[in-house]
Regions:
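Active-site neighborhoods and metal-handling regions in enzymes and metal-associated proteins
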Residues: 1-339
């Protein structure tokens, strides 16, 4: 089997008082499944011995700018010993290529955490929806930050450590800004409100986006558009299954939205043709300009490739989701004032 060596911060009683307990090398040996543990300050001195007589050195290429320099110094120290029989690694590989793909597949423990995070986030959205309607019924002023506060309260009340990302609460026309951040605008009766928010729980993210009537009641036009987007989401969920291509949920979404845009008159069939033409020419793009899903896990846009090599020099989007991989499906539609 392999041998694990950990380099970590040394034990420091004074820093423990300020920052919390750190294990240090000695405690790490007894509490973690490693065979050796050293202070991080001796990494450069220990590195040549760890690299010697290994065929490949794996490390993250792009995450720490100084690490490649330190690795190269260690390799040079080994190369200087080649005349004495030492073997220097002949390959350098990016460990993120392995770790990113490993992170895509969650075990049952991870899935349970993510299910709980999603439950907390769903409760937070419902809380904000109810609060918006209640405040408007009472004749109170409603601002976007009022609903943001309701989200954070629900997250923390149920054990979430943080929001998984900066929450978006956008009322009325503000919802047409995809990455809206002001979080201060008024919310009026008759407005639609978009909330894009999810909590982080035990290191795992959730991500939910919903649009709802601020006063609790859709107008006929709002309901028509909402039902169309909901139908596209249902199509995406139905297409998200083990063995499907990653792009399948997006294609299912686009098909429903494109037909719906023709049906409700957002697109004129006399000008753009049938649904196949709308999709081929991307006429839908003025209302739906982004992809439907993304990986979800320890980060809200989790690592892992969306393409895979199919042959030398070419790539394919035919990424087959496996059991335990998490995809966030999020159809939506942007209708700006005046459209």
């Amino acid at each position: 089997g392999g041998r694990s060596t950990l380099f970590c911060q040394p034990k420091d009683i004074e820093r423990d008082i300020w920052d919390g307990v750190r294990l240090g090398p000695e405690a790490a040996l007894s509490q973690l499944a490693v065979q050796e543990a050293w202070p991080s300050a001796v990494l450069d001195a220990k590195l040549p011995a760890l690299l010697e007589n290994k065929a490949v050195v794996w490390y993250p290429f792009a995450t720490h700018t100084e690490l490649p320099v330190r690795i190269e110094a260690g390799l040079n120290a080994v190369r200087a010993r080649v005349r004495y029989g030492a073997m220097c690694p002949t390959q350098q590989r990016d460990v993120c290529d392995l770790l990113d793909e490993m992170r895509l597949v969650k075990d049952e423990h991870e899935l349970n955490i993510m299910r709980r995070a999603s439950q907390i986030s769903a409760g937070a959205h419902i809380r904000a929806m109810k609060r918006s309607a209640a405040m408007l019924r009472a004749g109170q002023e409603v601002r976007e930050y009022h609903l943001d506060a309701e989200l954070l309260h629900e997250f923390r009340q149920h054990g979430s450590q943080y929001p998984a990302y900066g929450s978006i609460v956008a009322g009325g026309a503000n919802a047409c800004v995809l990455h809206y951040r002001a979080d201060a605008g008024p919310i009026l009766s008759g407005d639609l409100v978009l909330i894009d928010a999810g909590c982080e729980l035990d290191g795992y993210a959730s991500d939910i986006t919903r649009t709802f009537p601020a006063n609790g009641k859709f107008s006929a036009a709002q309901r028509e558009l909402y039902d169309l987007v909901l139908a596209s989401q249902d199509a995406a969920v139905a297409a998200t299954r083990e063995g499907a291509r990653f792009v399948d949920p997006h294609e299912a979404t686009v098909k429903v939205l494109a037909q719906g845009m023709l049906d409700v008159g957002l697109l004129d069939a006399n000008k753009v043709g049938h649904v196949q033409d709308v999709i081929a020419n991307r006429n839908y793009f003025q209302f739906y300009m982004h992809r439907t899903g993304h990986w979800l896990g320890m980060d809200v846009h989790d690592c892992g490739s969306y393409v895979e090599p199919s042959e030398v020099g070419t790539f394919s989007e035919r990424k087959d989701p496996l059991s335990g991989e998490l995809i966030k499906d999020r159809p939506s539609r942007v209708l700006r004032p005046g459209m």
